[in-house]
């Protein structure tokens, strides 16, 4: 028992085109001359594009000198060096590097750019684009014009502080116009804002993260080409949050009177802008007194914020099978960093009144009639089954002729794809034979041979099992000659095959996955098909072997030592992961998902458990070719490894069963969270039913301890409620590449941050783990204990 304290320490919620050279948020470099602060700006262009780098001289009488990687740049057939700009046409990979301009005979830098040339950019890859924007322009010269003026009608935008702001001015013209932004009538650059800006020229957009009051003003987009110019102005107002102590709804909790043995619920509705801390207290007596020497009442803490409790759960106090000792005064105490508030209610417990027993002949008649009807129903069912068995004819003789049936693909493709999901891709011949099938539930079937992928069965040596999948099993094997460059050298592969109890449906799924992998092709960051054994035996599908298992277990095995894990804490991991290693994992997975999206393939379940790691630490996405029946998924049933698939699914996939590339982006955001928690469990301790409500209310997971603010904002963009507002995988690759290039190779993880809240010891629901903080939503950590002074008494009651 403790006296009721009036102070609670709580944390508040912190909660060929031509490209312009101002694309990404600038950051100051360490080696720039101290005379003028120059920002290094990242510039990404596609092969064959035209690059224009601007330079504003301080003295127009002095000549300008351009340098690339420290060497002077001179004019050529592709390069034009001017007094105000450097223009490079038909750029190639060799044009990548660091460009700077300065006055001749002076060391002062005027501008500085990092240029990276990648594969040719295509606006068609941006899923945020509208079709009418892509089709704008018919070859005739025309001045700029707005393509979606209906989306630009809202000129005043008011957002709370810390939110992300995005302005768009979609336009078109011929030639393709350029766009630049003004703030309050002046040129708006990234260095003018502490958090930087993102300029996505392909989307005609300006993005500002973590808005602050200084961002208020008028933002004007100016779109122009040589035939004209248009502009549009938005007004931004950033609203500061008004701090206040928690507000409790009047009348709650309410007094209650119940009989002994009943169940009781007390409700307490709390309203607070800052994250509240809620406790339920019961007033007690000590030595016949309800108050201590200092005038504070004696109380027992019945319920407080814990590891796996949410605000919604804390707002209700449950008392089951109440006794006379439970009668008394109960208090709901809520506080935040501003102050506290509390409401109290009384519970009255009455003795049970024994009711006189009356014979209810109607009830007895109902029970007897029900029993008779049940017995009659069972008798009828037994008689019908006996009659059906007597009517069965003898088995038909074996079929003597060859019958064929088409195997239809069951994979996830976009409706506009050229690959029709109902087109027969493989025709299987069913063999008639007096012998039984090789597998008990699978008919003996003959698959047509594909010379491009067929592998000789005698050159394959099967090894130990690696695991079981949805419809088969996977074993390790040695394949001699499968590598065309080394025909006599064995290569370790993974072989997918049916289980002993496989069915015709399982075979159909395995063939569909094999055909899907053939069509998708090869990429470094996906599991690639190597071959197949389809003749003279069971079907074997040969794929690449990843020796280090799936990404989830790979990360957990490399967590820093000394933490409270379920496995041996004395075992030191063989490899130590740096922050750059984690960013590299995320970058490689994004590359693989970008490739699958380019092939119009929707994965539906991108998660760390579906990413495999090779001996060289290459990330490879697996199971993208599986045929999934989304209408038959048991959303409440855990998988074999204890994971809940719904925790990776986008809201539109959960509630409307709509699967798109945007829903894959949402799942990728959860995968990012897994990476930076080193294999943590998403939404630990949150029941599935509660998760549905939390997602609808806009709750999102908190920033992992070893994750930068920039990467966390990428996660939040992936979890945008509106699918079209989420980034594309191409944009995610660009963002990760930029973070990767700016990350130090010796930036190790912070070992002082506890990982046990993400440990596999915490079950997915009804967890009793006692970590220091299990806040999985965007809230700051709470203090370890509220300021309720206490010490232990021998009878277990807390006393002041």
Curated annotation (Swiss-Prot):
InterPro entries: FGF_rcpt_fam (IPR016248), Ig-like_dom (IPR007110), Ig-like_dom_sf (IPR036179), Ig-like_fold (IPR013783), Ig_I-set (IPR013098), Ig_sub (IPR003599), Ig_sub2 (IPR003598), Immunoglobulin_dom (IPR013151). It holds the Pfam family ig. Its EC number is 2.7.10.1. The chain crosses the membrane at residues 364-384. The second and third Ig-like domains directly interact with fibroblast growth factors (FGF) and heparan sulfate proteoglycans. Tyrosine-protein kinase that acts as a cell-surface receptor for fibroblast growth factors and plays an essential role in the regulation of cell proliferation, differentiation and apoptosis. Plays an essential role in the regulation of chondrocyte differentiation, proliferation and apoptosis, and is required for normal skeleton development. Regulates both osteogenesis and postnatal bone mineralization by osteoblasts. Promotes apoptosis in chondrocytes, but can also promote cancer cell proliferation. Phosphorylates PLCG1, CBL and FRS2. This is Fibroblast growth factor receptor 3. The gene is fgfr3.
């Amino acid at each position: 028992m403790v006296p009721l304290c009036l102070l609670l320490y709580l944390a508040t919620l912190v909660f060929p085109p031509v490209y312009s050279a101002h694309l990404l948020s600038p950051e100051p470099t360490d080696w720039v001359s101290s005379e003028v602060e120059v920002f290094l700006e990242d510039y990404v262009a596609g092969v064959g594009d035209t690059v224009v780098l601007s330079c504003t001289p301080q003295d127009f009488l002095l000549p300008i000198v351009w340098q690339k990687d420290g060497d002077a740049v001179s004019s050529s057939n592709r390069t034009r060096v001017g007094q105000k700009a450097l223009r490079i046409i038909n750029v190639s990979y060799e044009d990548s590097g660091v460009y700077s301009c300065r006055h001749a005979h002076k060391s002062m830098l005027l501008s500085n750019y990092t240029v990276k040339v990648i594969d040719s950019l295509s606006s068609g890859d941006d899923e945020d684009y509208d079709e009418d924007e892509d089709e704008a322009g018919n070859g005739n010269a025309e001045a700029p014009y707005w393509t979606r003026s209906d989306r630009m009608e809202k000129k005043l935008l008011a957002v709370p502080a810390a939110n992300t702001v995005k302005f768009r001015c979609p336009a078109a013209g011929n030639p393709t116009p350029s766009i630049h932004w003004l703030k309050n009538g002046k040129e708006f650059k990234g260095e003018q804002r502490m958090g930087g800006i993102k300029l996505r020229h392909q989307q005609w957009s300006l993005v500002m993260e973590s808005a602050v009051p200084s961002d208020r003003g008028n933002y004007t987009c100016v779109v122009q080409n040589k035939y004209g110019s248009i502009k549009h102005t938005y007004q931004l107002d950033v609203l500061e949050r008004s701090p206040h102590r928690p507000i409790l709804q009047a009348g709650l909790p309410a007094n209650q009177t119940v009989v002994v043995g009943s169940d009781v619920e007390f409700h307490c509705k709390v309203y607070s802008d800052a994250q509240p801390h809620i406790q339920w207290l019961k007033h007690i007596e000590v030595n016949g007194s309800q108050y201590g020497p200092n005038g504070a009442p004696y109380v027992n803490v019945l319920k407080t914020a814990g590891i796996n409790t949410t605000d919604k759960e804390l707002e209700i106090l449950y008392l089951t099978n109440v006794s006379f000792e439970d009668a008394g005064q109960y208090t709901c105490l809520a506080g935040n960093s501003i102050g506290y508030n509390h409401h109290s209610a009384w519970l009255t417990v009455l003795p049970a009144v024994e009711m006189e027993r009356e014979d209810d002949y109607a009830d007895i008649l109902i029970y007897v009639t029900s029993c008779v009807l049940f017995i009659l129903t069972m008798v009828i069912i037994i008689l019908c089954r006996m009659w059906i068995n007597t009517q069965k004819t003898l088995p038909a003789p074996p079929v003597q002729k060859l019958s064929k049936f088409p195997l239809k693909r069951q994979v996830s493709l976009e409706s506009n794809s050229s690959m029709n999901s109902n087109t027969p891709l493989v025709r299987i011949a069913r063999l008639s034979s007096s012998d039984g099938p090789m597998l008990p539930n699978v008919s003996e079937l003959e698959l047509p041979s594909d010379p491009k992928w067929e592998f000789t069965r005698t050159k394959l040596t099967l090894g130990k099992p690696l695991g079981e999948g949805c419809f088969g099993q996977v074993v390790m094997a040695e394949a001699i000659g499968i590598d065309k460059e080394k025909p006599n050298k064995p290569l370790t592969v993974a072989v997918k095959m049916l289980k002993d109890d496989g069915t015709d449906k399982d075979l159909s799924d395995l063939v569909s996955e094999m055909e899907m992998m053939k069509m998708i092709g090869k990429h470094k960051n996906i599991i690639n098909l190597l071959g197949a054994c389809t003749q003279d035996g069971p079907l074997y599908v040969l794929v690449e072997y990843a020796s280090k298992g799936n990404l989830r277990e790979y990360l957990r095995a490399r967590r820093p030592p000394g933490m409270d894990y379920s496995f041996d804490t004395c075992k030191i991991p063989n490899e130590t992961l740096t922050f750059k290693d984690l960013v590299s994992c995320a970058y490689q997975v994004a590359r693989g998902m970008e490739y699958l999206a380019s092939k119009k393939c929707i994965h539906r379940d991108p998660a760390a458990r579906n990413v495999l790691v090779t001996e060289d630490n290459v990330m490879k996405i697996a199971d993208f070719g599986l045929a999934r029946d989304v209408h038959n998924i048991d959303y409440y049933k855990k998988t074999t490894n204890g994971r809940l698939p719904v925790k990776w699914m986008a809201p539109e996939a959960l509630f409307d069963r709509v699967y798109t590339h945007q829903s894959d982006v949402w799942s990728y955001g959860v995968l990012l969270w897994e990476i930076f928690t080193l294999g943590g469990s998403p939404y630990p301790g949150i029941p599935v039913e509660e998760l549905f409500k939390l997602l609808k209310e806009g709750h999102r997971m908190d920033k992992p301890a070893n994750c930068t603010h920039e990467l966390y904002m990428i996660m939040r963009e992936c979890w945008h409620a509106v699918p079209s507002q989420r980034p594309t995988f191409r944009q995610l690759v660009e963002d990760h590449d930029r973070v990767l290039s700016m990350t130090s190779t010796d930036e190790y993880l912070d070992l002082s941050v506890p990982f046990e809240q993400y440990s596999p010891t915490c079950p997915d629901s009804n967890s009793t783990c006692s970590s220091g903080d299990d806040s999985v939503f965007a809230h700051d950590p709470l203090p370890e204990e509220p300021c309720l002074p206490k010490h232990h008494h021998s009878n277990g009651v807390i006393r002041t």
